[in-house]
A protein has these predicted regions:
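Membrane-interface transmembrane helices that cradle and orient dolichyl/undecaprenyl
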Residues: 156-177, 214-218
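Short hydrophobic/aromatic helix or loop-helix immediately within or flanking a transmembrane segment
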Residues: 47-54, 67-90, 285-297
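Membrane-proximal lumenal/periplasmic loop motifs of glycosylation machinery
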Residues: 34-43, 56-79, 93-94
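Membrane-interface micro-motifs in multi-pass membrane enzymes
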Residues: 70, 74, 121-167, 192, ...
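Transmembrane-helix motifs of polytopic, lipid-linked glycan transferases
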Residues: 97-123, 158, 162, 319-326
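Membrane-interface alpha helices of multi-pass inner-membrane proteins
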Residues: 176-205, 246
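Hydrophobic/aromatic-rich transmembrane helices and adjacent perimembrane loops
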Residues: 147-155, 308-315, 339-345, 349-387
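Transmembrane alpha-helix segments characteristic
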Residues: 180-186, 239-245, 329-357
Length: 397
C-alpha cells in the first residue's frame, strides 16, 4: 500500500515538473523585466514605448508622424505595449512589463499548441519552457526582454500550429476555420516585412515539397489519385505551405508596395547579394553561428558562471546537431509530423545559411525564428529514441 502511494506521488511530481520548469522560465523573464530591466537605458526600447503612446493618442494602427527605423511592422510588440499604457499611462516601466507579460503568455500558448499538434505529448511543456528560458544573452535581449524577435518567432509558430490543427480537424468547419486563421497569421508576418518570408515560409514550402516527394516516391501506388490518397497528410501539409505562403506574400506586397507610399520606414527589401569573400568558409561560419546561438559566448572565463553557462550552450548546439543526424538516419521510423519538423529545420538551416552568406547585411540574431523548430527536433529525438541498454534487455527478456 505504501509503495503504491509512493509510486502515485512520484508520478504526480513527475507530471508537475515540466510545468514547474515552464513557470520558472516565465517568472525569471518577468523578474528580469521588473528588477534589472528597470535600470536598462536603451533607445530602441524607449522608441517602442513612444510609438505605442503615439498610436494610442492617434487611435490608429500605424502613424504618419513616425519613422520606422527597423522595418514597418504592422503586427508587432506595440499592440501589447499599448495595452500596458492604457493601464499604466504614467509608468512606462510597468506598462512595458505588463505588455511583455501578455506577449510571453501568448508565445507560450502558441508553443504548447504547436507541440501538441506535432505529437510531443508530455514533452510539450518542456519544449515551451526551453523556449521561454533566456538561454543566451542575445536571446535574452532580442527575444525575452527586448521582444524585437518575439513576434518573428510567434507568428511562424502560430501559422504552423494552425495548419496542423486544420489537418487534424475531423469536421469541415473547424478545418476551414483553422486554415483561415493560419492565413491571417501568415498575412500578419508578411505585413511585418520580408524577414519571415525568407526565414520561415520559404523553408516551410521546401520542407513540405521534400516530404511529399519522398512520400509519393515510396508509397508504391501507380496512379496519382491513389498516391495522393495514401499520402494525404503530406499533401495537406504541402497545401498548407502553399496557401500560407500566398498569404505571407500578399502581406509583404501590401507592406512594400502600398504602405511604403504612405509611411516612412527602413526596408530590408533593398538588401543586395554580395559574393562571400571566403566562399564555403563563410557558409560554414554562418551555420556554426546558428549552433552557437543556444548560449555560447566568446571571451568568458571557463570556470566563471558565465563560462559554465556558455559551455552548456555549446553542448546544446552539439546535441542539436546530433539530434538532426540521428533523426535523419531514423527518418522512415518517424511519424509524418516528426519527419516534417526535421526537414523543416534542415531547410531553415540550408536556406538561411546560404542566404546569409550572400547577403550584404547579416546578424546572428537573424536565426531566432528557427529556434522553435530546433527545440521541437530535440524533443522529437528524446521522444522517439529507443534505448536498449544491457539491463533493459534483461528486463525485456
Amino acid at each position: 500500500m505504501d509503495k503504491q502511494m509512493k509510486g502515485s506521488s512520484l508520478k504526480k511530481i513527475g507530471a508537475l515538473l515540466p510545468w514547474l520548469w515552464l513557470a520558472a522560465g516565465y517568472v525569471l523573464d518577468m523578474w528580469f523585466q521588473l528588477v534589472p530591466g528597470k535600470w536598462i537605458v536603451d533607445s530602441d526600447l524607449a522608441s517602442e514605448m513612444m510609438l505605442a503612446k503615439i498610436l494610442n493618442q492617434e487611435g490608429s494602427i500605424l502613424s504618419h508622424s513616425w519613422y520606422y527605423s527597423t522595418e514597418l511592422r504592422v503586427v508587432n510588440m506595440q499592440w501589447f505595449y499599448r495595452l500596458g499604457l492604457l493601464l499604466f499611462p504614467d509608468d512606462w516601466h510597468l506598462a512595458r512589463t505588463f505588455g511583455m507579460a501578455i506577449a510571453l503568455l501568448v508565445f507560450i500558448a502558441a508553443a504548447l499548441l504547436l507541440a501538441r499538434e506535432i505529437g510531443l505529448g508530455s514533452l510539450s511543456p518542456w519544449m515551451a519552457g526551453a523556449l521561454i528560458w533566456p538561454f543566451g544573452m542575445r536571446y535574452l535581449v532580442y527575444a525575452m526582454y527586448g521582444g524585437y524577435y518575439l513576434i518573428h518567432m510567434l507568428l511562424p509558430m502560430l501559422t504552423l500550429a494552425l495548419v496542423f490543427c486544420s489537418i487534424h480537424a475531423q469536421n469541415r468547419r473547424p478545418k476551414v476555420l483553422c486554415a483561415v486563421l493560419a492565413c491571417l497569421a501568415a498575412l500578419g508576418a508578411g505585413l511585418n516585412g520580408v524577414k519571415v518570408l525568407m526565414v520561415f515560409q520559404a523553408p516551410f514550402l521546401l520542407a513540405t515539397m521534400l516530404l511529399a516527394v519522398m512520400a509519393l516516391n515510396s508509397c508504391g501506388k501507380t496512379t496519382w489519385k491513389d498516391a495522393c490518397r495514401t499520402c494525404g497528410t503530406e499533401m495537406q501539409l504541402l497545401a498548407g505551405a502553399l496557401y500560407t505562403t500566398v498569404a505571407a506574400m500578399a502581406g509583404y506586397v501590401i507592406n512594400a508596395k502600398i504602405l511604403a507610399k504612405s509611411y516612412s520606414f527602413k526596408s530590408f527589401g533593398g538588401v543586395t547579394w554580395s559574393r562571400p569573400r571566403d566562399g564555403l568558409f563563410e557558409l560554414q561560419r554562418i551555420i556554426v553561428d546558428y549552433f552557437h546561438e543556444f548560449g555560447y559566448t566568446d571571451g568568458v572565463g571557463v570556470f566563471h558562471f558565465s563560462g559554465i553557462a556558455s559551455g552548456l550552450g555549446l553542448l546544446i548546439g552539439i546535441w542539436l546537431a546530433f539530434c538532426i543526424v540521428r533523426l535523419l538516419f531514423r527518418y522512415r521510423s518517424l511519424a509524418v509530423a516528426e519527419r516534417f519538423m526535421v526537414l523543416l529545420l534542415c531547410s531553415m538551416i540550408a536556406v538561411c545559411g546560404i542566404s546569409f552568406s550572400y547577403f550584404q547585411e547579416y546578424s546572428q540574431y537573424f536565426w531566432f525564428p528557427s529556434m522553435p523548430a530546433a527545440f521541437a527536433v530535440m524533443a522529437i529525438e528524446i521522444k522517439t529514441e529507443k534505448l536498449h541498454l544491457p539491463g533493459e534487455r534483461r528486463t525485456l527478456a
